Amino acid sequence: MAGVGRTMIAPLLVLNLIMYLIVIGFASWNLNHYINGETNHPGVAGNGATFYFLVFAILAGVVGAASKLAGVHHVRSWGAHSLAAGAASALIAWAITALAFGLACKEIHIGGYRGWRLRVLEAFVIILAFTQLLYVAMLHGGLFSGNHAAGAGGYGGDYPADHHHKPAAAARV
């Protein structure tokens, strides 16, 4: 993971952003019909875990899409100063997506009729749980790669306040 660069992270960032937007669309449609009491609608139905799954799926979609904005900023600036925000928000998005993943698995395990939109939403959440984990691993691999912009305050980089981390003899100017 030491050689992970923006050429590898950027396509995964775009893929995850598109998938999170699709999750927002399907989750909001299903949740709207579920709240309206249209559980006999061919696209909704579900079981006891459906409501909880829909709530966490829409939450994962919104937080995931928002974390991709921090990721876009990091890929554009490619500095250590933006890496922390991008990695932290991606980790939070993955945690919420993992919760939605667990509820999707529970909903599939319980069984019963589920409409095609609900099954598509389950599939997207399951796929996103793994692609987001890969994205988080790639970002955290960037913490140790040292291939960020020079002078951006990264680990081991020379920046104006770097004298605090050197022996006293070397800190004198």
Curated annotation (Swiss-Prot):
It is a multi-pass membrane protein. GO terms for cellular component: membrane. Keywords: Membrane, Stress response, Transmembrane, Transmembrane helix. Its main location: membrane. Induction: Induced by heat shock. Induced by drought, cold and salt stresses. Induced by abscisic acid (ABA). It comes from the Eukaryota. InterPro entries: AWPM-19. Expressed in roots, leaf blades, leaf sheaths, stems, spikelets and embryos. It is found in: Membrane. The keyword Transmembrane applies. The chain crosses the membrane at residues 9-29, 43-63, 83-103, 124-144. May be involved in abiotic stress response through abscisic acid-dependent signaling. This is Membrane protein PM19L. It comes from Oryza sativa subsp. japonica. The gene is PM19L.
